[in-house]
C-alpha cells in the first residue's frame, strides 16, 4: 500500500506576504529603454529584481503615438508612482536606445522627487560587429 505524501504548502501561498506592498525599497535602479517605436521604463531593486514597470503602450498610447516624448514621460511617471509609495528615495538611472523619449523620461524621473545618484547611457555600440540592414528607400 502506497504511503500518503504529506501536502507541503504551495509556493504561491508563501509568496503572497512578500508581494509588492510589503517590501520597502530605499534605493533602486531605473532602466529606460527608448526605441523609436516605444519607451519601456523598468524599476528594479539593487539586486536586479523587478519592482515596477510601465511602457508607453501600457499607459494607453497606441500606434505611432507610443514613440512620442509625452508617452515616455507618462510611462516613466506611471512606473515611478508605485515605488515612491514603497519608500524609494535614491535611484540610479540607466538609459538605453536612440528614441525620442530619452530626455522626456529623464525629466519625469527628476520631477518625481527621487534623488538620482547618477545617470548612465548604456546604449550598446558595436565595435563594427554585424552588418546593418540595408537603408530604406521610400
Swiss-Prot record:
It is found in: Plastid, Chloroplast. One of its GO terms (cellular component) is ribonucleoprotein complex. Keywords: Chloroplast, Plastid, Ribonucleoprotein, Ribosomal protein, RNA-binding, rRNA-binding. Residues 9-22 have a biased composition (Basic residues). The keyword rRNA-binding applies. Residues 1-22 are annotated as: Disordered. GO terms for molecular function: rRNA binding; structural constituent of ribosome. It comes from the Eukaryota. SUPFAM superfamilies: Translational machinery components. One of its GO terms (biological process) is translation. Part of the 30S ribosomal subunit. NCBIfam families: PRK05309.1, uS11_bact. Belongs to the universal ribosomal protein uS11 family. This is Small ribosomal subunit protein uS11c. The gene is rps11.
Amino acid at each position: 500500500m502506497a504511503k500518503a505524501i504529506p501536502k507541503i504548502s504551495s509556493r504561491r501561498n508563501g509568496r503572497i506576504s512578500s508581494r509588492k506592498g510589503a517590501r520597502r525599497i530605499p534605493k533602486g535602479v531605473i532602466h529606460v529603454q527608448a526605441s523609436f517605436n516605444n519607451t519601456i521604463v523598468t524599476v528594479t531593486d539593487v539586486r536586479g529584481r523587478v519592482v515596477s514597470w510601465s511602457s508607453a503602450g501600457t499607459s494607453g498610447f497606441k500606434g505611432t503615438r507610443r514613440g512620442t516624448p509625452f508617452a515616455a514621460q507618462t510611462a516613466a511617471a506611471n512606473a515611478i508612482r508605485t515605488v515612491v509609495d514603497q519608500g524609494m528615495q535614491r535611484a540610479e538611472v540607466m538609459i538605453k536606445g536612440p528614441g525620442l523619449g530619452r530626455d522626456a523620461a529623464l525629466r519625469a524621473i527628476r520631477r518625481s522627487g527621487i534623488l538620482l545618484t547618477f545617470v548612465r547611457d548604456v546604449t550598446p555600440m558595436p565595435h563594427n560587429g554585424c552588418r546593418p540592414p540595408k537603408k530604406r528607400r521610400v
